[in-house]
C-alpha cells in the first residue's frame, strides 16, 4: 500500500529545512512505499529550493510549484491530483499535529471502510492543549457555526489534517474549485454527495502558530461562502 503525504507551503523558508527532515525521516522509517509532495503555492522566499535539493537525492520527494499565490485550497488540490498513493494525507508544513498521527490515520484506513478521514481537535480531551481559553472558545464556536451552516455532523471541518483513499481523493478534488480556506468544506460536501463514507480521528495541536483566521472578521464571509458552496455543490455536475 502506497502512502502519499502532501505538504502545502507558502513562504516557509524559516521552517522548511526542519519540515523536510521531519517528514522525510518519518515516511522513510514507517512506510515501505511512499511519496512526499511539497506544493509551493507561489512563495517568494525561495523555500522550494530546499525541496528541490532533497528531490535530487531521493525522487520520492517531489516539488510542485506555481505562481502566483492561489491559496491553500489550490495547493492541496494540486497535490491531490498529482498523487499516486493508495492513501493520500495532507498536513501543515509546521507539523502542527505531529507525525505520529500519520501512521495512526493509515492504520484506521486499513482497519475500516472509510473513504475519507477528517482530523478533529474536538474528539480528544487534549485536542486544544496549549490554546488560551479565549482562542479555544472562539475556535469551537466558529467550527460549530460552520458545521450547522454546512449541515455537517462532523466536529472539526477546518482541521489541517485529513486523509483520503487515493481513488476518492483524486475524484473529490477533480470536482473542487475553492482555492482558499473554505476548500475543506467544499471537499467534504463533494465527498458526501459522491456517497463516500467519512470518519474522524482525534488529533492534538502540538505546534502553535498564530491563526490566520480572525473569527470576528472572517465568520460572516465564511458563512456566505458556505451558503454559496452548498448551492454550487448541489447543482454541480460531478465527474
Where are the regions that the model predicts?
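Conserved donor nucleotide-binding strand/loop of the catalytic core
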Residues: 34-37, 48-82
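Short, well-formed alpha-helical segments that are part of the catalytic scaffolds
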Residues: 12-27
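Catalytic donor-sugar/metal-binding loop of nucleotide-sugar-dependent glycosyltransferases
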Residues: 153, 178-179, 188-206
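Short aromatic/hydrophobic "clamp" motif used to bind/position activated sugar donors
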Residues: 88
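Acceptor/aglycone-binding surface of glycosyltransferases and processive sugar-polymer synthases
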Residues: 66-82, 99-181, 208-224, 237
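A conserved acidic beta->alpha catalytic loop
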Residues: 40-49, 95
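Cell-envelope/extracellular polymer assembly enzymes that use nucleotide-activated donors
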Residues: 2-4, 35, 186
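Donor nucleotide-sugar binding loop of glycosyltransferases
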Residues: 12-15, 43, 72, 98
Amino acid at each position: 500500500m502506497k502512502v502519499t503525504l502532501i505538504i502545502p507551503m507558502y513562504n516557509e523558508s524559516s521552517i522548511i529545512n526542519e519540515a523536510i527532515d521531519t517528514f522525510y525521516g518519518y515516511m522513510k522509517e514507517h512506510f515501505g512505499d511512499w511519496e512526499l509532495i511539497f506544493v509551493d503555492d507561489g512563495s517568494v522566499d525561495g523555500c522550494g529550493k530546499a525541496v528541490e535539493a532533497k528531490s535530487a537525492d531521493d525522487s520520492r520527494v517531489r516539488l510542485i510549484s506555481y505562481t502566483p499565490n492561489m491559496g491553500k485550497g489550490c495547493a492541496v488540490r494540486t497535490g491531490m491530483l498529482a498523487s499516486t498513493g493508495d492513501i493520500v494525507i495532507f498536513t501543515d508544513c509546521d507539523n502542527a499535529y505531529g507525525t505520529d498521527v500519520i501512521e495512526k490515520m493509515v492504520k484506521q484506513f486499513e482497519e475500516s471502510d472509510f473513504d475519507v478521514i477528517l482530523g478533529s481537535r474536538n474528539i480528544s480531551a487534549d485536542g486544544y492543549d496549549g490554546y488560551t481559553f479565549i482562542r479555544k472558545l472562539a475556535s469551537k464556536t466558529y467550527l460549530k457555526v460552520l458545521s450547522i451552516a454546512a449541515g455537517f455532523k462532523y466536529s472539526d471541518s477546518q482541521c489541517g489534517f485529513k486523509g483520503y483513499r487515493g481513488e476518492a481523493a483524486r475524484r473529490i478534488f477533480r470536482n473542487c474549485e475553492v482555492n482558499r480556506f473554505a476548500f475543506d468544506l467544499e471537499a467534504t460536501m463533494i465527498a458526501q454527495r459522491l456517497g463516500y463514507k467519512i470518519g474522524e480521528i482525534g488529533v492534538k495541536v502540538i505546534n502553535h502558530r498564530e491563526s490566520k483566521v480572525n473569527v470576528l472578521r472572517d465568520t460572516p464571509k465564511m458563512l456566505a461562502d458556505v451558503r454559496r458552496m452548498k448551492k454550487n455543490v448541489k447543482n454541480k455536475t460531478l465527474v
